[in-house]
Amino acid sequence: VSWLGDVYKRQDLSKYSYIELKTGFHYYQGFRSPIDAEKEEKGYSLGWLHHKGRNKHHWEYWLDFGVDGIYACKMPTNYVIEMFCDRVAASMIYQKEKYTDSSALEYYENGRGKILIHPETDALIHHLLKYLSEHGLDQTIHYIITEIKE
C-alpha cells in the first residue's frame, strides 16, 4: 500500500536533528522515552518541543491559541493513523517481551484525561487502539486500509 511507504519515509525524521539526537543520547534508558527523563530533570524537554512542532502525528502539534485560549484542532485522519503506528511502535520498543496488543491502549487510557485533544481525534485514536487490543495487529492494519484510510 503506497501510503504506508509515505508514512515510513517521513515518519519522525526530525529525530535525526541535533537537538533531538542530543536528548536521545543523553537521556537514553531503553525502557521509556528519553524525553520523559529530560522532563524529570529539567521540567521540560527541548527535544520534545522541537519534535512535536515538526511531526503532525502528535496531538500536541494541533493545539492553537484563539480568543478563548488554547484549543485542540481536529487532526486529519492520515495523521491519526500515523499516531496509531507511532504509539504501537513505541509500546513494542519500550515494553519489549512484555508487549501485548493492549499495551498502547492501556498507555493511552492512562493519560487520556490529562491531554487536550479534539474529541473526534480522541474518539478515532481510542477506537483504533481498542480495535488492536481486540483483533490483533494484522487485522487492525487490514481494517485501517479497508475501512479508515481516506
Show where each model-derived region lies.
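Short secondary-structure boundary/capping segments
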Residues: 7, 21-25
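Short active-site segment of divalent metal-dependent hydrolases/proteases
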Residues: 10, 14-15, 89
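Divalent-cation-assisted or electrostatically stabilized phosphate/pyrophosphate-binding catalytic cores
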Residues: 27-34, 102-121
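Alpha-helical scaffolding flanking metal-ion-dependent phosphate/phosphodiester catalytic sites
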Residues: 41, 48-99
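Short, small-residue-biased leader/transition segments that mark boundaries at the very start
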Residues: 1-8
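Charged phosphate-binding loop/patch that engages nucleotide di/tri-phosphates or the phosphate backbone
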Residues: 113-150
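Acidic, glycine-rich loop-and-strand cores that form catalytic or ligand-binding grooves
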Residues: 24, 31-47
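Catalytic Zn2+-binding segment of zinc metalloproteases
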Residues: 13-22, 96
